[in-house]
Design a protein with these regions (language model features):
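Glycine-rich phosphate/ribose-binding loops and adjacent secondary-structure elements
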Residues: 200-206
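Conserved, well-structured core domains of diverse proteins
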Residues: 1-176, 182
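Active-site pocket-lining/capping segments in soluble small-molecule metabolic enzymes
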Residues: 171, 176-197
Length: 206
């Protein structure tokens, strides 16, 4: 194998990554130059080689093709959703700067931002459309005993930013065990957002 790798294999041989791909990783890790002047190692005329060609008259994009309407005639407020959106990531798992940036990006790009099961924070309200995710812990719409709170739900559901509500049926990352918010992470701000008592460990059922 050593002779094959160092003496006989070409730059484009080897699996799962060839020598050229491995070299790029090494160079980037060392912050070294990644470009080579003149010529190329690949054969652009070979069958299967793919490239992008410039067009003198580029086609105009029909952005309506990248949206889908959610809700039929029975829905009072159907939503025109982008096919590309921001997946569920809670405030607490991500910083306030990250959540604010993602939401502002959703506003600029006209797509939706999933809150994650951690509730709707102030940083989610930067003008982007929201998909409010409600998990097994009912964060943001629960009472002091952890039961579903109708009044809090109605209050959050009526926010103009909330376009859809997603019900998370189980803890997929920890099946059979449920989630856990440690007491040290349950700060007064997190507790306010999630309708919790601060500085106490909180379990989310599986």
């Amino acid at each position: 194998p050593e002779f094959r790798q160092y003496f006989f294999e070409g730059e484009l041989d080897g699996k799962p990554f060839n020598r050229r791909q491995r070299s790029i990783v090494y160079q980037r890790a060392k912050n070294e130059k990644q470009t080579i002047s003149f010529g190329m190692q690949d054969e652009p005329n070979r069958i299967g080689y793919e490239w992008a060609a410039h067009s003198i008259y580029p086609k105009k994009n029909d952005f309506s093709q990248f949206r889908v309407t959610i809700g039929n005639s029975q829905c009072s407020k159907p939503y025109s959703a982008s096919i590309f959106n921001i997946s569920a990531m809670s405030y607490g798992a991500l910083s306030k700067t990250a959540i604010s940036s993602l939401n502002e990006g959703a506003k600029m790009g006209n797509f939706a931002h999933n809150t994650g099961e951690g509730g709707i924070s102030d940083y989610h309200l930067k003008g982007g459309d929201l998909i409010w995710q409600i998990g097994t812990g009912y964060f943001g719409c629960r009472d002091g005993k952890g039961h579903f709170n109708d009044a809090l739900f109605v209050e959050k559901a009526n926010l103009k930013e909330v376009k859809m509500i997603e019900i998370k049926l189980s803890q997929g990352a920890k099946p059979g065990h449920g989630g856990l918010l440690p007491a040290e992470k349950n700060t007064p701000e997190i507790a306010r957002i999630r309708a919790l008592e601060p500085h106490k460990t909180v379990h989310s059922p599986s």
